Amino acid sequence: MALIVHKYGGTSMGSTERIRNVAKRVAKWARAGHQMVVVPSAMSGETNRLLGLAKELAPAKQGDAYGRELDMLAATGEQASSALLAIALQAEGMESVSYAGWQVPIRTNSAYTKARIESIDDARVRKDLAQGQVV
């Protein structure tokens, strides 16, 4: 049994039909006995749509406070995709859970909109994987 990490981009996550196809692919690997970690992007065009809304509200805003909110906004696209994929995996009969970055937790530096990961505490992920969940 191997630990396998799949990354799916916005096009692969672009509709419920495509999310269902990703879930079927991931479920196939999980049923073969592999531990699966899936990292989905936001649905195609969603990040641009969300950031476009922010620019309509404050087109030339600068500073850490604004950058922080842009990061919070952009993350919602990935959070939605993660939850939708977990739901699709559950529909395929798989135990699955999604996380927001703070739930893992993933720690970054404070370079808003260009942050770098400093650490990942993978204890929760490993625990859920050991219990047979797709994460």
Model-derived features: where do they sit?
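Nucleotide/pyrophosphate-binding catalytic subdomain
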Residues: 1-135
